[in-house]
């Protein structure tokens, strides 16, 4: 017996019984993004490894532990399956000069890859939708992005299950001053740090505060706060952002320990969090990355964006029973006898041209078997064609979901008959 193959651990198939749920969510996202003036960009799944090391940060979990990296056997280049979408999008912006006399607002959707321990809401292949708004330095675009995500939750019916947490990371100089104070603080508490904390203490001290280790929580809570090191300009930006969010009627929680796991963030950062999914509670996160475009070879320009975990949002929608029932076809065509198959095929094309979704039985099967399939398909109507109907130029119309007598009508009256029955 031939070997059976299985999907790679942590990388899941989306079967037809679930794919309609993805389509529903994707359609809602596309409508939202169009309403806010965002344009789609599609970048390769594979990028050169140095792009991610430069943008995400060398001393981050993603770069150190989670990237799927391999060597191109043809030229020896180090390549990586994208672990997030911002770096590749900005690489494309710089490469194709999209910032020339423009402030692009871009969105992407697709699979990302991280070598993590698979669990509910955390996978090795996962899907993100993300946005990047470029060339806009004020807090107004930061507020609009929050408004857009809040709008999505409202449209999906999950506003009551999510909360917004925000913080400001300041600029490079302010973070440097805070970093110096934080390292000094951590050095005084080095005896209680775990091995990961000791390793990061001098390379990425902010991430030490983002610990999930309960034994370190008290130490982290008492650490110097970045908010105490914000200068006038960063503080004004943060206060302006908060004022706009409040004016839009969006509730938020200030979280001084919200630092995000990617090194490119500065000033505004945020997370949308839910308590309904256990440990994997963050469903959308992002922030400002002024300076990153310049680091990737472009001109100096501001930027802000977010990434949304699509699987996690779908899990929340499923948990709350907010996904629609699977869409069924409008018409199932049953055919019996010589010539009925071709007759039905022509009729099916006419129906599809008029906007109906149609499944035609193909191959040999009894009338009883075909009617059973018609009922199981979820179709609203069965159209029945046999040799007698072909000779008379007629079709039998049977309603499958309503107590209506079946009727035999002329073939050219089928569309009008269906329209009447659906009214």
Curated annotation (Swiss-Prot):
Its main location: cytoplasm. Its EC number is 6.1.1.21. The keyword ATP-binding applies. GO terms for molecular function: ATP binding; histidine-tRNA ligase activity. InterPro entries: aa-tRNA-synth_II, aa-tRNA-synth_II/BPL/LPL, Anticodon-bd, Anticodon-bd_dom_sf, His-tRNA-ligase, HisRS-like_core, HisRS/HisZ, HisRS_anticodon. It is an enzyme of class 6 (ligase). It comes from the Bacteria. The keyword Ligase applies. It catalyses: tRNA(His) + L-histidine + ATP = L-histidyl-tRNA(His) + AMP + diphosphate + H(+). GO terms for biological process: histidyl-tRNA aminoacylation. PROSITE patterns: AA_TRNA_LIGASE_II (PS50862). Keywords: Aminoacyl-tRNA synthetase, ATP-binding, Cytoplasm, Ligase, Nucleotide-binding, Protein biosynthesis. It is found in: Cytoplasm. GO terms for cellular component: cytoplasm. Homodimer. PANTHER family: HISTIDINE--TRNA LIGASE, MITOCHONDRIAL-RELATED, HISTIDYL-TRNA SYNTHETASE. Belongs to the class-II aminoacyl-tRNA synthetase family. This is Histidine--tRNA ligase. The lineage of its organism: Bacteria, Pseudomonadati, Pseudomonadota, Betaproteobacteria, Neisseriales. The gene is hisS.
């Amino acid at each position: 017996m031939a070997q059976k193959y299985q999907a790679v651990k942590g990388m899941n198939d989306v079967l037809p019984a679930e794919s309609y749920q993805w389509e529903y969510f994707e359609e809602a996202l596309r409508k939202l993004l169009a309403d806010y003036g965002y344009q789609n960009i599609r970048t390769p799944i594979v990028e050169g490894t140095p792009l991610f090391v430069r943008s995400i940060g060398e001393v981050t979990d993603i770069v150190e532990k989670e990237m799927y990296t391999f060597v191109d056997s043809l030229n020896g280049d180090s390549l990586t399956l994208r672990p997030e979408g911002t770096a590749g999008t900005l690489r494309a912006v710089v490469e194709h000069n999209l910032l020339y006399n423009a402030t692009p607002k871009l969105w992407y959707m697709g699979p990302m890859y991280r070598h993590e321990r698979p669990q509910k809401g955390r996978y090795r292949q996962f899907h993100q939708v993300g946005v990047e708004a470029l060339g806009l330095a004020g807090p107004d675009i930061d507020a609009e992005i929050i408004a857009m995500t809040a709008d999505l939750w409202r449209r999906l019916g999950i506003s009551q299950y999510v909360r917004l947490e925000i913080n400001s990371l300041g600029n490079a100089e302010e973070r440097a001053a805070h970093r110096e104070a934080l390292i000094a603080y951590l050095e005084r508490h080095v005896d209680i740090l775990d091995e990961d904390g000791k390793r990061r203490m001098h390379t990425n001290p902010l991430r030490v505060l983002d610990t999930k280790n309960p034994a370190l929580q008290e130490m982290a809570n008492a650490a110097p706060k970045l908010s105490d090191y914000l200068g006038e300009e960063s503080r004004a930006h943060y206060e302006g952002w908060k004022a706009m969010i409040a004016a839009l009627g969006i509730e938020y929680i200030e979280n001084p320990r919200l630092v995000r796991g990617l090194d490119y963030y500065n000033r505004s950062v945020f997370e949308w969090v839910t308590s309904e999914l256990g440990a994997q509670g963050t469903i959308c996160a992002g922030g400002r990355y002024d300076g990153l475009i310049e680091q990737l070879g472009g001109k100096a320009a501001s930027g802000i964006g977010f990434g949304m975990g699509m699987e996690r949002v779908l899990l929340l929608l499923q948990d709350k029973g907010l996904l629609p029932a699977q869409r069924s076809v409008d018409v199932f065509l049953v055919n019996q006898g010589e010539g009925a198959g071709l007759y039905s095929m022509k009729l099916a094309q006419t129906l599809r041209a008029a906007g109906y979704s149609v499944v035609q039985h193909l191959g040999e099967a009894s009338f009883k078997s075909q009617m059973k399939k018609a009922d199981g398909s979820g179709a609203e109507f069965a159209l029945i064609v046999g040799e007698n109907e072909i000779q008379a130029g007629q079709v039998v119309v049977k309603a499958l979901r309503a107590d209506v007598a079946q009727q035999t009508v002329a073939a050219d009256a089928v569309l009008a008959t269906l329209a009447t029955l659906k009214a």
